[in-house]
């Protein structure tokens, strides 16, 4: 193999086509644009959807996202039941080791599922039903 014998892979180098220059050129009349009409013409502005009511007009003008709202990671009672032994301490570190949460956000315990083991739970927040279930199983819930 020598440099002067190297060839490009098929399809890597495509010859330039001058479009809209007559039938004989191979790309005359519609110039590869299909039918005449709106889509044959020049481009369109940002947000234009072809006459359909655009997204920014379909959504409402009301409401906003509160910059101070807290977004919680959710852990359910069934997750605690599956991943922890009786009399265990459930905190952020143990939940992270059990692969139930990421470190970045606060955690809220919700009451989905049943809890039969006595656990000591220390988290940022919990629903009323989750706290009741932990205490009914003989455990204790503490807010961080």
Swiss-Prot record:
Positions with biased composition (Basic residues): 15-26
Recorded GO CC terms: cytosolic large ribosomal subunit
Record key words, sorted: Ribonucleoprotein, Ribosomal protein, RNA-binding, rRNA-binding
One GO MF term attached to the UniProt entry: structural constituent of ribosome
Superkingdom, natural source: Bacteria
Intrachain disulfide bonds: none
Complex and partners: Part of the 50S ribosomal subunit.
Family, similarity comment: Belongs to the universal ribosomal protein uL15 family.
PANTHER family for this protein: 50S RIBOSOMAL PROTEIN L15 (PTHR12934), LARGE RIBOSOMAL SUBUNIT PROTEIN UL15M (PTHR12934:SF11)
Functional note: Binds to the 23S rRNA.
The name this protein goes by in its record: Large ribosomal subunit protein uL15
């Amino acid at each position: 193999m020598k440099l002067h014998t190297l060839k490009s892979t098929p399809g890597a180098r495509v010859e330039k086509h001058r479009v809209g220059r007559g039938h004989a050129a191979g790309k005359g009349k519609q110039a590869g644009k299909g039918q005449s009409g709106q889509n044959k013409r020049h481009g369109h502005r940002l947000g234009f959807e072809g006459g359909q009511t655009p997204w920014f007009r379909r959504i409402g003008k009301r409401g906003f996202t509160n910059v101070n709202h807290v977004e919680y990671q959710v852990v359910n009672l069934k997750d605690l039941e599956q991943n922890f032994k009786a009399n265990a301490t459930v905190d952020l570190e143990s939940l992270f080791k059990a692969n139930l949460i990421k470190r970045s956000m606060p955690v809220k315990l919700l009451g989905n599922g049943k809890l039969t083991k006595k656990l000591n739970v220390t988290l940022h927040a919990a629903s009323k039903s989750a706290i009741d279930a932990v205490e009914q199983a003989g455990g204790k819930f503490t807010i961080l």
